[in-house]
């Protein structure tokens, strides 16, 4: 499960020459040094916390949880993301140094889950805010699934090129309170338009009473 396709070198050869590229050397050095920023807002985060114990021992993958986004290169989102928390999540992502990666953990993070059907304040997928590298479905995903997602991410890092990193930094997208895409300034440069996430606290009730008044009285009689 933890194997990455890289050539093994002969330890007995004393006068050997190793040739590689700077891109491959950079990828190899980052394989076992992913430092995640834990962003847990719901019950899925409890499953990730089980990896800290001795049974799964996620330290063997080089994962060192960080409390500051400036020291992390991986953010693991677990749980429901609301419109109120969306600016904070985007800002944390912006403060992470390049290259950086995102793992979306759980159904609520990927699609909004059961809260996305009738909730006006739930983001229907964290990929509407930040680019996601690995999707981890489940409600909640098991610790073994988290390990599998990290393994797949490490395999992607091993095949990454410099052009892929530049392309991921040029995406311009964000998500409004009406659950619509907005194409404008890049959300990864600190110029995120906070006004797109503003919603009047009286708007939901106004819509409700407007709908209630439009329904005739005979339709409410059984």
UniProtKB/Swiss-Prot annotation:
This is NAD(P)H-quinone oxidoreductase subunit K, chloroplastic. Disulfide bonds: none annotated. GO terms for biological process: aerobic respiration; electron transport coupled proton transport; photosynthesis, light reaction. PANTHER family: NADH DEHYDROGENASE (PTHR11995), NADH DEHYDROGENASE [UBIQUINONE] IRON-SULFUR PROTEIN 7, MITOCHONDRIAL (PTHR11995:SF14). It comes from the Eukaryota. Pfam families: Oxidored_q6. It is a peripheral membrane protein. Signal peptide: none annotated. NDH is composed of at least 16 different subunits, 5 of which are encoded in the nucleus. NDH shuttles electrons from NAD(P)H:plastoquinone, via FMN and iron-sulfur (Fe-S) centers, to quinones in the photosynthetic chain and possibly in a chloroplast respiratory chain. The immediate electron acceptor for the enzyme in this species is believed to be plastoquinone. Couples the redox reaction to proton translocation, and thus conserves the redox energy in a proton gradient. [4Fe-4S] cluster binds at residues 43-44, 108, 139. It comes from Chloranthus spicatus (Chulantree). Its cofactor is [4Fe-4S] cluster. Its EC number is 7.1.1.-. SUPFAM superfamilies: HydA/Nqo6-like (SSF56770). One of its GO terms (cellular component) is chloroplast thylakoid membrane. GO terms for molecular function: 4 iron, 4 sulfur cluster binding; iron ion binding; NADH dehydrogenase (ubiquinone) activity; quinone binding. Belongs to the complex I 20 kDa subunit family. InterPro entries: NADH_UbQ_OxRdtase-like_20kDa, NADH_UQ_OxRdtase_20Kd_su. Keywords: 4Fe-4S, Chloroplast, Iron, Iron-sulfur, Membrane, Metal-binding, NAD, NADP, Plastid, Plastoquinone, Quinone, Thylakoid, Translocase, Transport. It is found in: Plastid, Chloroplast thylakoid membrane. HAMAP family: NDH1_NuoB. Binds 1 [4Fe-4S] cluster.
């Amino acid at each position: 499960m933890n194997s990455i396709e890289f050539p093994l070198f002969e330890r007995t050869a004393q006068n050997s020459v190793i040739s590689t590229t700077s891109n491959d050397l950079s990828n190899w050095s980052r394989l076992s040094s992913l430092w995640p920023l834990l962003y847990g807002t719901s019950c899925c985060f409890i499953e990730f916390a089980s990896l800290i114990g001795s049974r799964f021992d996620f330290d063997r993958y080089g994962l060192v949880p960080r409390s500051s986004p400036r020291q992390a290169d991986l953010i693991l989102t677990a749980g429901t993301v609301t419109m109120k928390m969306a600016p904070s999540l985007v800002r944390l992502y912006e403060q992470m140094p390049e290259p950086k990666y995102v793992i979306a953990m759980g159904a609520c993070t990927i699609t909004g889950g059961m809260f996305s059907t009738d909730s006006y304040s739930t983001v229907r997928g964290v990929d509407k805010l930040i680019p996601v590298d690995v999707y981890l479905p489940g409600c909640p995903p098991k610790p073994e699934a988290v390990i599998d997602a990290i393994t797949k991410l490490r395999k992607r890092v091993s095949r990454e090129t410099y052009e892929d990193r530049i392309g991921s930094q040029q995406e311009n997208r964000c998500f409004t309170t009406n659950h619509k895409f907005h194409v404008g300034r890049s959300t990864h440069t600190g110029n995120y338009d906070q006004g797109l996430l503003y919603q009047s606290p009286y708007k939901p009730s106004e819509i409700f009473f407007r709908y209630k008044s439009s329904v005739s009285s005979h339709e409410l009689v059984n």
